[in-house]
Amino acid sequence: MMKKLFLFLMLMTAMVVNAQTKNAVQEVRDYLHECGVFYIATVDGDQPRVRPFGVAEVLNGKLYIQTGKKKKVFKQMMANPKFEITAVKPSGTEWIRISGKLVNDDSREAKAYVLDKNPELKSMYSADDDNTAVLYITAGVAQFCSFSAPMKEIKF
């Protein structure tokens, strides 16, 4: 009986943690969408590189970004998957910082989902081409910052 109760409690805890993670990922995605453009920092040898991005989508509880495999930024992400993202809300007084590691997802499902959510990219990318790259964040930490409120941090 105790073993069944223990297993039940473990299952419930896992479900709560999973739900919290999904909510955190969605919160980060919504914030990025509100900002519009976000900037991702990578490393090229010993030189930092920063570029504007605009695609952030949630699939299967993971936050995805999109780029092209032929781009230098993709090669940098594969050589060193650690990154930082920052974005500022239109007010200019609130911003987000995100760090973690990026994992390439070559599945057609992920590519198609991200492209379907961002149809303007379909003139340059396809779920079936060898160039489209969608990457998801692992070990993500998001810091929501403001000039007038304490920083809030969530992990996803």
Which sequence ranges carry the predicted segments?
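Bacterial Sec-dependent N-terminal signal peptides
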Residues: M1-T21
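Short, basic/aromatic recognition patches
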Residues: T21-D30
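A short, Trp-centered hydrophobic/proline-enriched beta-strand micro-motif
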Residues: D30-G45, F83-A87
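A mature extracytoplasmic/lumenal domain signature
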Residues: D44, K69, K89, L102, ...
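Short, exposed beta-strand/loop patches in secreted or surface proteins that constitute
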Residues: G54-E57, L102
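A short mixed-secondary-structure module that forms the rim of ligand-binding clefts
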Residues: A56-S91
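Active-site-adjacent structural patch at catalytic or cofactor/ligand-binding sites
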Residues: A79-F83, E94-V103
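Charged, gly/pro-rich active-site loop segments
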Residues: R97-F156
